[in-house]
């Protein structure tokens, strides 16, 4: 999978950009706040219809314009498809080969992207919601049915919470049963993904860090024993909901389910959040991204595109070198931002392009 060409119009501070990237490495360099990250964001949007900055639609439209346009020509297995994303204050519209797309299934898998930004480290240090969002996005990227299961669960959760807040008990059992049913679907798909990446995560972490450490990732259900869930996932969630019934009615909200669960990042048997150094935490997050890349490669028989934002400022010299050596061995397209080309080792890479980004313009 390769992005052969990208065209931007009125996206953030980028007025009009047309690029023909290299099929391997593309480096956007220049001073801060010039538009480098915006270029990566546009590619991510083209693949996911979402911003990794969690921005409002209006914030992505250039000042003075009514609409942004992001257009890309993506090649896979010798076939090129045109993807166009239109953004305005009301929302987003997607076209595939100039035909409007209304279902996510039609859009899914046409441009697979994985992003690493400096903010990703907050996944380790921050609140559980950040880790859940990472996991949900990773699972959905390789399994479109997960999004349907997740949305169904969220609708049921919303209705159940309305009933709990009202204090009305009539009909609550029905919503509780549905919540357990769809909650199991969400949790099981999350667990399947974590089991799939466990060995990959360990391998990639040690490749990047140049060490031999014990790397684990564990799912931690809220107010529910993981061992019991794995033995009897049909009954464990329902049982936990029964135990919390009185407290839920008192608080007026659902206390158990995948919307409350967390993930533990573990290194050498200890919590990475409390005991890991910054270098270890960054290596772990990068290893998560590399694992995601491998899963997507296996799923679609084609590697995704990797976006690395300001990578060199986040890794020490040894980890940076190990990462670049690792990426050189992977047959995938990579887009990197940096403040200086001196931070990136392009030795031995024949297929690459560098682009100077200054004041919203790209100089070839």
UniProtKB/Swiss-Prot annotation:
InterPro entries (UniProt xref): DNA-binding_RecF, P-loop_NTPase, RecF/RecN/SMC_N, RecF_2
UniProt GO BP: DNA replication; DNA synthesis involved in DNA repair; double-strand break repair; SOS response
Any single Gene Ontology cellular-component annotation: cytoplasm
Binding site for ATP: 30-37
Keywords: ATP-binding, Cytoplasm, DNA damage, DNA repair, DNA replication, DNA-binding, Nucleotide-binding, SOS response
Subcellular location: Cytoplasm
Protein function: The RecF protein is involved in DNA metabolism; it is required for DNA replication and normal SOS inducibility. RecF binds preferentially to single-stranded, linear DNA. It also seems to bind ATP.
Protein name: DNA replication and repair protein RecF
Gene of this entry: recF
């Amino acid at each position: 999978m390769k992005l052969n060409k990208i065209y931007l119009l009125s996206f953030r501070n980028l007025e009009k950009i047309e690029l023909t990237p290299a099929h391997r490495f593309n480096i956007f360099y220049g001073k801060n706040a010039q538009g480098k990250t915006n270029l990566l964001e546009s590619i991510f949007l083209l693949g996911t219809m979402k911003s990794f900055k969690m921005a409002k639609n209006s914030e992505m439209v250039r000042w003075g314009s009514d609409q942004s346009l992001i257009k890309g020509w993506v090649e896979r297995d010798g076939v090129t498809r045109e993807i166009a994303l239109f953004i305005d204050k009301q929302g987003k519209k997607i076209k595939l080969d100039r035909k409007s797309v209304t279902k996510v299934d039609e859009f899914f898998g046409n441009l697979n992207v994985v992003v690493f930004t400096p903010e990703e480290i907050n996944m380790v240090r921050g609140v559980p919601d950040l880790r859940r969002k990472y996991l949900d996005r990773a699972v959905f990227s390789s399994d479109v049915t997960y999004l349907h299961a997740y949305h169904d669960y969220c609708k049921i959760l919303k209705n159940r919470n309305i009933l709990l807040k009202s204090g009305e008990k009539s009909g609550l059992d029905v919503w509780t049963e549905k919540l357990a049913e769809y909650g199991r679907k969400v949790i099981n798909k999350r667990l399947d993904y974590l089991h799939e990446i466990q060995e990959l995560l360990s391998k990639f972490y040690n490749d990047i860090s140049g060490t031999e450490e014990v790397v684990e990732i564990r799912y931690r259900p809220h107010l529910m024993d993981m061992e019991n869930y794995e033995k009897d996932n049909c009954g464990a969630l329902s049982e936990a909901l029964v135990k919390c019934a009185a407290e839920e009615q008192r608080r007026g909200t659902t206390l158990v389910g995948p919307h409350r669960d967390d993930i533990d990042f573990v290194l050498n048997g200890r919590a990475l959040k409390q005991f890991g150094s910054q270098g270890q935490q960054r290596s772990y997050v990068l290893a998560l991204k590399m694992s995601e890349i491998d899963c997507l490669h296996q799923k679609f028989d084609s590697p995704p595109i990797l976006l690395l934002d300001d990578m060199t400022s986040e890794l020490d010299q040894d980890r940076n070198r190990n990462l670049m050596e690792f990426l050189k061995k992977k047959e995938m397209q990579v887009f990197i931002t940096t403040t200086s080309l001196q931070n990136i080792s392009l030795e031995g890479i024949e297929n690459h392009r560098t682009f100077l980004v200054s004041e919203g313009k790209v100089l070839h």
